[in-house]
Amino acid sequence: DKELLNKIILTIKEVRKKHGVTLETFYFDTGIHLARIGQGKTNISVSTLSKICNYFNLSLADFFKLLES
């Protein structure tokens, strides 16, 4: 669902900016290319989303609460 993917992308972006982390720093630290996900060039898996949440010390449950708000 493209709408859900867009919400996930926007929520990741908000969390990343809240923590003051650049795309480059995030990629260097995790190897996850958020720009590709954000541009819709690749889909996001649950395991990738889990890695993103772990990086920001956020549970998947809390991430989805942010997604709904």
Where in the sequence are the language-model features?
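A short, Lys/Arg-rich alpha-helix, primarily the initiator
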Residues: 1-19
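Helix-turn-helix DNA-binding elements, focusing on the entry/boundary residues of the two helices
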Residues: 12, 23, 46-49
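The alpha-helix within a helix-turn-helix
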Residues: 16, 27, 53
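Short alpha-helical DNA-recognition segment
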Residues: 19-36
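Short, basic-rich loop-to-helix N-cap that marks the start of a DNA-contacting helix
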Residues: 41-54, 60
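Short C-terminal boundary/hinge segments that cap the last helix of small helical domains
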Residues: 57-69
